[in-house]
Amino acid sequence: MSKPIVMERGVKYRDADKMALIPVKNVATEREALLRKPEWMKIKLPADSTRIQGIKAAMRKNGLHSVCEEASCPNLAECFNHGTATFMILGAICTRRCPFCDVAHGRPVAPDTNEPLKLAQTIADMALRYVVITSVDRDDLRDGGAQHFADCITAIREKSPAIKIETLVPDFRGRMDRALEILNATPPDVFNHNLENVPRVYRQVRPGADYNWSLKLLERFKEAHPEIPTKSGLMVGLGETNAEIIEVMRDLRRHGVTMLTLGQYLQPSRHHLPVQRYVSPEEFDEMKAEAMAMGFTHAACGPFVRSSYHADMQAKGLEVK
């Protein structure tokens, strides 16, 4: 029997080390058991990476993180090449250990009190007009990191008054009242929280999270700010069915959510949950049609769609696949 891992503060635990800490064990996928990617999942990288390297350099210079890099997003090259990025605040170590996610798990250090100003200055220097701010889960903080979100929103708006800000927040487990009290005083332009998948597979996909809690978070923010769009995202390929996805979409509408993202799950490493199916572009189109018929004002559905993928276009209601 292997020795238990003793986590050191500030150390990133990834792949096999991270999965070893999850109560519901996941057996590493052997190469021959991997599903072959269909043609529609092939990514063409840009010929010129100058813009990509420039954004990475700006991040490193200011000690900032992007979820694009930390979560190994397949759209990194495209988004960075277009000068867009989703900033990840509160460090790069998550207190949760979801087996679909490539963000590191561990015992995070205290939040950087200078991060809001550094973030605001970086965004101003990049002359961004739309920005997405997300974070790791911080179950070690009494407010789940809500005040840090609010401080970042305030600092960004001071330096870039015309900017639109979307927040992709964690579930603030056990801290919803306090978190919403803080965020209600400094609301974003779009409030996003991802359900990720269907309730039947939550124990395997989102250990430590609760489906109904996440729905309630979205509903309560919408009740306080009916004029602000609420948004949520789902992944397919984790053992769910299309019928179950459509039922989750109905739950989201019942809780006031108006914007939806739906994309294909991709396995970050052999130690993460395996891809159980690849959903075709035609099926994504069918689910988008279902979403629009339910009353979603915007629905971005496609193999490479992620919650913050072309978020500015999503907010404008433009076609995103």
Curated annotation (Swiss-Prot):
InterPro entries membership: Aldolase_TIM (IPR013785), Elp3/MiaA/NifB-like_rSAM (IPR006638), LIAS_N (IPR031691), Lipoyl_synth (IPR003698), rSAM (IPR007197)
Cofactor: [4Fe-4S] cluster
Documented EC number(s): 2.8.1.8
Single Gene Ontology MF annotation: lipoate synthase activity
Predominant subcellular localization, coarse grouping: cytoplasm
PROSITE patterns per UniProt: RADICAL_SAM
SUPFAM superfamilies in the record: Radical SAM enzymes
Details of cofactor binding: Binds 2 [4Fe-4S] clusters per subunit. One cluster is coordinated with 3 cysteines and an exchangeable S-adenosyl-L-methionine.
Substrates-to-products reaction catalysed: [[Fe-S] cluster scaffold protein carrying a second [4Fe-4S](2+) cluster] + N(6)-octanoyl-L-lysyl-[protein] + 2 oxidized [2Fe-2S]-[ferredoxin] + 2 S-adenosyl-L-methionine + 4 H(+) = [[Fe-S] cluster scaffold protein] + N(6)-[(R)-dihydrolipoyl]-L-lysyl-[protein] + 4 Fe(3+) + 2 hydrogen sulfide + 2 5'-deoxyadenosine + 2 L-methionine + 2 reduced [2Fe-2S]-[ferredoxin]
Residues holding [4Fe-4S] cluster 1: 68, 73, 79, 308
Top-tier EC class: transferase
Domain (Radical SAM core): residue spans on this chain: 80-297
Keywords annotated in UniProt: 4Fe-4S, Cytoplasm, Iron, Iron-sulfur, Metal-binding, S-adenosyl-L-methionine, Transferase
Keyword Transferase (UniProt): yes
Pathway in which this enzyme or protein is active: Protein modification; protein lipoylation via endogenous pathway; protein N(6)-(lipoyl)lysine from octanoyl-[acyl-carrier-protein]: step 2/2
Gene3D superfamilies tied to this protein: Aldolase class I
Sequence similarity: Belongs to the radical SAM superfamily. Lipoyl synthase family.
Protein name from the UniProt record: Lipoyl synthase
Gene name as annotated: lipA
